[in-house]
Amino acid sequence: MGKKRSASSSRWLQEHFSDKYVQQAQKKGLRSRAWFKLDEIQGTDKIFRPGMTVVDLGAAPGGWSQYVVTQIGDKGRVIACDLLPMDPIVGVDFLQGDFRDELVLAALMERVGDAKVQVVMSDMAPNMSGTPSVDIPRAMYLVELAFEMAKDVLAPGGSFVVKVFQGEGFDEYLGQIRSLFTKVKIRKPEASRARSREVYIVATGRKL
């Protein structure tokens, strides 16, 4: 006999399947509702252009990568990484592994190569326990790693898009990003659930 679902997980499932973005994603054959978040960010911030090389961290199931390939065209390239498996997408070079593992990071950097990239984006999040004092530090660790990679591989003028959960360490992290980019915005896309602490920092114009 299966375990009874908790009230919170049952509520999440109910919200998930009644969510208009989930329904639209299913109708359009999209990987996830995250596609709509990035579409809204692109509409306001014009991050992606044809021919770009983009790094996608926390890529599975592929909503962001799926969106980006429509924006960067045949001459563009997406290098994606996730702990979870992801079905292939044309134009996406996917590496499955834990981004926190030095060997995985080295393999990812090898795929990036010597040329700088135009965008680093991260939708990474830890498995949430529901306890902010546990979840926020875990999430901040991931976004710090994403920022370190952005510093290493972004070309001058490049952009960084990162999901961050508001809480302890957020203001300090935002300050670090502002020191490296000429323009920094905080976005809460309509497709992001209102109850969620998540926001997206959109940083453009990586300084020399």
Curated annotation (Swiss-Prot):
- What are the EC numbers? 2.1.1.166
Give the record's family classification: Belongs to the class I-like SAM-binding methyltransferase superfamily. RNA methyltransferase RlmE family.
**Function of the protein:** Specifically methylates the uridine in position 2552 of 23S rRNA at the 2'-O position of the ribose in the fully assembled 50S ribosomal subunit.
The UniProt keyword set, sorted, is: Cytoplasm, Methyltransferase, rRNA processing, S-adenosyl-L-methionine, Transferase
Coiled coil, from the record = none
* Enzymatic class: transferase
Cite the InterPro entries for this sequence: RNA_methyltr_RlmE (IPR050082), RNA_MeTrfase_FtsJ_dom (IPR002877), rRNA-MeTfrase_E (IPR015507), rRNA_MeTrfase_gammaproteobac (IPR004512), SAM-dependent_MTases_sf (IPR029063)
Q: Name one Pfam family in it.
A: FtsJ
Q: What reaction does this enzyme carry out catalytically?
A: uridine(2552) in 23S rRNA + S-adenosyl-L-methionine = 2'-O-methyluridine(2552) in 23S rRNA + S-adenosyl-L-homocysteine + H(+)
UniProt subcellular location: Cytoplasm
Organism per entry: Edwardsiella ictaluri (strain 93-146)
Annotated gene = rlmE
Q: What is its main location?
A: cytoplasm
- Which PANTHER family does the UniProt entry name for this protein? RIBOSOMAL RNA METHYLTRANSFERASE, RRNA METHYLTRANSFERASE 2, MITOCHONDRIAL
GO molecular function annotations of the record: rRNA (uridine-2'-O-)-methyltransferase activity
Instruction: List the protein's name.
Output: Ribosomal RNA large subunit methyltransferase E
Entry GO terms, CC? cytoplasm
Residues engaged in binding S-adenosyl-L-methionine: 62, 64, 82, 98, 123
| Signal peptide annotation | none
- Catalytic positions? 163 (proton acceptor)
Domain of life the protein comes from: Bacteria
